[in-house]
Amino acid sequence: MYRVDINSDIGESFGAYKIGMDEEVVKYISSANIACGFHAGDPMVMALTVDRCLKNVVSIGAHPGFPDLLGFGRRNLDASSEEIKNYVIYQIGALQAFAAIRGTKLQHVKAHGALYNMAAVDEKIAMAIAEAIASVDRNLICVGMANTAMERAAEKVGLRFAYEVFADRNINPDGTLVSRKHPNAIIHDEELACKRVLRMVKEGVCEAIDGTLVKVKVDTICVHGDNPQAVEFAKKIRETLEENGVDILPMGEFV
């Protein structure tokens, strides 16, 4: 029996700026990573997005990033461990409040953009994030890629860890994500994305950008909500998985 979660980064609009196709994407995912106001999102959008997830029976997670609206949280910032820990606590707490007044709880936490990538390789940053999550709620699941500093930090503080892969991103031979600056970082071919995802779930391998096969662990598959093809990607990926005997469930039900 195969089972997997499908997640997407949503709630990234703010003020007069609309980003993503959240109202459509939520129909095909099982977990949502909601921006918490630092790299994107605002109080009105956070409230709307939590409501949207509850309406579509989608589990809710916090998506904390660096305080960098202009860079959409994709620029590396020089922040201390204490600063990062407090950034994450602040953002989890904000979303946690919107969930609590609606009678629900957060399922997971997934760092955003540069913070996610830095935590994959920097032990201090990863530990700051893990300690922040644990200090708020030890029942929260930490989301990240396998064989990373983030996985090791989550294990050290006793958090459950969900192994993530990306439907629309190429990977390097070491399993890390290809930089968005690379022309082939993003996978735009739906059929190719579906084949890659199915192979990752059923065989535990993924073809790297140089053609080598990389072993992967998969609990949750990310489809980026700010990608113009996000809706069609999410729909096709879910259909492909279900047609091939894979159950789609929120990560909290099996991690």
From Swiss-Prot:
<comment type="subunit">
    <text>Forms a complex composed of PxpA, PxpB and PxpC.</text>
</comment>
<dbReference type="Pfam" id="PF03746">
    <property type="entry name" value="LamB_YcsF"/>
</dbReference>
<dbReference type="GO" id="GO:0017168">
    <property type="term" value="F:5-oxoprolinase (ATP-hydrolyzing) activity"/>
</dbReference>
<dbReference type="GO" id="GO:0005975">
    <property type="term" value="P:carbohydrate metabolic process"/>
</dbReference>
<dbReference type="InterPro" id="IPR005501">
    <property type="entry name" value="LamB/YcsF/PxpA-like"/>
</dbReference>
<dbReference type="GO" id="GO:0005524">
    <property type="term" value="F:ATP binding"/>
</dbReference>
<protein>
    <recommendedName>
        <fullName>5-oxoprolinase subunit A</fullName>
        <ecNumber>3.5.2.9</ecNumber>
    </recommendedName>
</protein>
<comment type="function">
    <text>Catalyzes the cleavage of 5-oxoproline to form L-glutamate coupled to the hydrolysis of ATP to ADP and inorganic phosphate.</text>
</comment>
<keyword id="KW-0067">ATP-binding</keyword>
<keyword id="KW-0378">Hydrolase</keyword>
<comment type="similarity">
    <text>Belongs to the LamB/PxpA family.</text>
</comment>
<keyword id="KW-0547">Nucleotide-binding</keyword>
<dbReference type="InterPro" id="IPR011330">
    <property type="entry name" value="Glyco_hydro/deAcase_b/a-brl"/>
</dbReference>
